[in-house]
């Protein structure tokens, strides 16, 4: 299924992206759910899938984490089932992510899907990432507040909420409506009837993650082996003093590594192309031989990217799931990065190069791409 998003992107980016929340009425016309509540509940029974149940009764909140064995204990009100990265495990839902590729792939994270019964929700809270919340089956009331300093508290160890807030948006969403919320705006949603919601979340690494990730890269490659030296050690009034110029020199030693463009590019490509959630990787058995890949493509078969696989381009280099893809065939690499589905035409002359075919076979045999059907 193909989803057509009714949105003036230039206007949206100028007025709302990372600035102001907005309700996009009928963002998807004639919206059809790509997954049923039963299918979602089935996914939450799988150990590889990240899921949780959130419920509340008389002001008391409960959170439990999957995999779940049964839902028989649940009542008819006040609970939600939330499943992360459903686009990794259920191919039809991945189609919901594609209309949002007007925004950079490296910023898109995953598709979280929730099923809620009347009164179900997770309470008023803040997120530090952008999110588009698509209303599927059913109706849900959403309230969004102004971006202010707000106290957060934990009504349950696994649930972070904010105090009640005054709403700047108070809307009832119907199938196909979309609520966009930038980082830091408090919000809460409660189902008015059995309801499905689809949250396209965006990824924004913080400074701590970046420094930690780069430090891992430095350690793995044994970079930064230069030692501090001070042949012109300056005199000081007290032997315990560390002088400002020494602090500057130490900081420069660290910055020197970050300021090497090739290393920084290689690290960031590996770092940002890794998914934060497990992928449904299923290497083919038996593995494909390069000539089988060639024949299949030439016969018109379509090669499809695994749901949730992050394929990103930095300059001329392409990265997939933390690995750099090496090949001199730039147009073919661009096709891998740009297209979800690929045909022989996308690869062009690269298919006549045995080394490219061997590389493509390795990617398919890793489970990163698969033949449709």
From Swiss-Prot:
Task: Give the consequence of mutating residue 140 to A.
Answer: Loss of binding of 2-oxoglutarate
Q: Which InterPro entries match?
A: JmjC_dom, NO66-like, ROXA-like_wH
**Domain JmjC as annotated: residue spans:** 92-219
Q: What is the free-text note on the cofactor? A: Binds 1 Fe(2+) ion per subunit.
**GO MF term set:** 2-oxoglutarate-dependent dioxygenase activity; ferrous iron binding; protein homodimerization activity
- EC numbers: 1.14.11.47
Tell me the keywords, alphabetical order. Answer: Dioxygenase, Iron, Metal-binding, Oxidoreductase
Q: Which PROSITE patterns match?
A: JMJC
Record-stated family: Belongs to the ROX family. RoxA/YcfD subfamily.
Quaternary organization: Homodimer.
Name recorded for this polypeptide:
Ribosomal protein uL16 3-hydroxylase
């Amino acid at each position: 299924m193909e989803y057509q998003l009714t949105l003036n992107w230039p206007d949206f980016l100028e007025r709302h992206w990372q600035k102001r929340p907005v309700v996009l009425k009928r963002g998807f016309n004639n919206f059809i759910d790509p997954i049923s509540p039963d299918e979602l509940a089935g996914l939450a029974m799988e150990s590889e899938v990240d899921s949780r149940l959130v419920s509340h009764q008389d002001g008391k909140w409960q959170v439990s984490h999957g995999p779940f064995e049964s839902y028989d204990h649940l009542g008819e009100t006040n609970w939600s089932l939330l499943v992360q990265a459903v686009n990794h495990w259920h191919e039809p839902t991945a189609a919901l992510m594609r209309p949002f590729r007007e925004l950079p792939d490296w910023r898109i994270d995953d598709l979280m899907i929730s099923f809620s019964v009347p009164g179900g929700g997770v309470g008023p809270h803040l997120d530090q990432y952008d999110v588009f919340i698509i209303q599927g089956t059913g109706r849900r009331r959403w309230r969004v507040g102004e971006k202010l300093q707000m106290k957060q508290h934990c009504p349950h160890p696994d649930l972070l909420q904010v105090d009640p807030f005054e709403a700047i948006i108070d809307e009832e969403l119907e199938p196909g409506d979309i609520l966009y919320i930038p980082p830091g705006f408090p919000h809460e949603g409660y189902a008015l009837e059995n309801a499905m919601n689809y949250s396209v979340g965006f990824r924004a690494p913080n400074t701590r993650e970046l420094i930690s990730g780069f430090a891992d890269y430095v350690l793995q490659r044994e970079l930064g082996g230069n030692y501090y030296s001070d042949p012109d050690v300056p005199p000081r009034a007290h032997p315990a003093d560390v002088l400002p110029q020494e602090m500057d020199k130490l900081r420069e030693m660290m910055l020197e590594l970050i300021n090497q463009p090739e290393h920084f590019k290689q690290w960031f490509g590996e770092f940002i192309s890794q998914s934060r959630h497990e992928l449904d990787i299923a290497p083919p058995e038996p593995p494909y031989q390069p000539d089988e890949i060639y024949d299949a493509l030439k016969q018109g078969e379509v090669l499809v990217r695994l749901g949730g696989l992050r394929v990103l381009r930095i300059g001329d280099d392409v990265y997939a799931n933390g690995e750099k893809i090496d090949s001199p065939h730039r147009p073919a690499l661009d096709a891998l990065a740009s297209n979800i589905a690929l045909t022989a035409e996308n690869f062009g002359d690269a298919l006549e190069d045995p080394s490219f075919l061997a590389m493509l076979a390795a990617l398919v045999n890793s489970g990163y791409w698969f033949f449709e059907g």
